[in-house]
């Protein structure tokens, strides 16, 4: 026979922000524990193709900027490659639990990144929103300044120094 006593339990209530933060941390930890942290088959990941050999600089910038982020794998071009030796053939990294990939494109295309596709971040608080907005817009372009546009407390849209588009929101 098993007897469980619950006489000394405290009834604590967590607000929505605390629950959301715990879920985010849990999801991030689960992603970090995947075998070798490489993308699984059929998993959808963002792949950033850089045409100006900025893949490594961009990846390092993002990993340093976002919490719970790390570089997982980097495969470089060799001497016989179509681009300068040592440039990124493909790399995998995580940003707060989300997997991304990038490369330095060997052929130069007549296209680049477009703000029609952007990374969207629901920020935890105003401090995080302003910090990310400030860092991402540094040497980039502000598409929509931080403001209340009627659909959330505060929203901003930037194109960073590497041409990648970011929408930052605070509910």
Residue ranges and their predicted role:
Residues 17-44, 48-50, 72, 94, ...:
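Vicinal oxygen chelate
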Residues 89, 98-106, 112, 149:
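Conserved, structured core segments of small domains
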Residues 38, 83-89, 111-113:
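A generic structural micro-feature
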Residues 25, 49-97:
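Core segments of cupin and vicinal oxygen chelate
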Residues 79-80, 105-107:
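Short beta-turn/strand-loop junction motif enriched in small, turn-promoting residues
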Residues 2-5:
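C-terminal motif of bacterial Sec signal peptides marking the signal peptidase cleavage site
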Residues 7-17:
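Bacterial Sec signal peptide processing site at the extreme N-terminus
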Residues 43, 88, 116:
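Conserved catalytic motifs of the protein kinase core domain
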């Amino acid at each position: 026979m098993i007897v469980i006593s619950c006489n000394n339990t405290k009834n604590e209530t967590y607000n929505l922000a605390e629950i959301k933060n715990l879920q985010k941390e849990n999801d991030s930890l689960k992603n970090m524990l995947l075998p070798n942290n490489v993308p699984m088959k059929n998993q959808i990941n963002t792949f950033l193709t850089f045409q100006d050999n900025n893949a490594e600089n961009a990846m390092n910038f993002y990993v340093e900027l976002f919490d719970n982020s790390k570089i997982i794998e980097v495969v470089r071009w060799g001497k016989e490659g179509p681009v300068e030796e040592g440039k990124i053939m493909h790399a995998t990294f995580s940003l707060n639990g989300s997997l991304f990939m990038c490369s330095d494109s060997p052929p130069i295309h007549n296209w680049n990144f477009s703000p029609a596709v952007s990374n969207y971040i629901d920020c935890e608080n105003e401090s995080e929103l302003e910090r990310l907005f400030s860092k991402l817009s540094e040497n980039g372009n502000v598409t929509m300044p931080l403001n209340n546009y009627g659909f959330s407390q505060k929203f901003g849209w930037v194109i960073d120094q590497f041409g990648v588009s970011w929408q930052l929101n605070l509910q």
